[in-house]
């Protein structure tokens, strides 16, 4: 885990609507990195997110501009720290980061995380099961200050 700086980048959000003014939605579903507005720098992944929604499938594009004043947590790969962070966030434990970036636990990986949390598989078995998964990426904007770093560039209907 690194705490620090992220470079400017183009990011995507897949949904059933164009999201010109992103918001942090707090609902009962705990996600990998807690509550926030989730994006990715992998356009194909955003398309997959959009296609899983009911109704239209839309990918919104944003320009992220770095802000050194924000508290940012980055995971460059799935590590022990990443696993512990995901387990805590998925259990409802809050963190104080403005932005969190790293790999995502898709549905299959989340099944493995649940099995690990329940003691059904060992940590070693978890790592063996996830090591052959395709690369994923997510960046979550957890605070209003963090949302100020992204600018809506447009959207595409799939």
Where are these regions (language model features)?
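Conserved NAD+-utilizing ADP-ribose enzyme module
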Residues: 2-7, 19, 31-32, 48, ...
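Short N-terminal edge-element motif at the start of the domain
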Residues: 3-31, 35-40
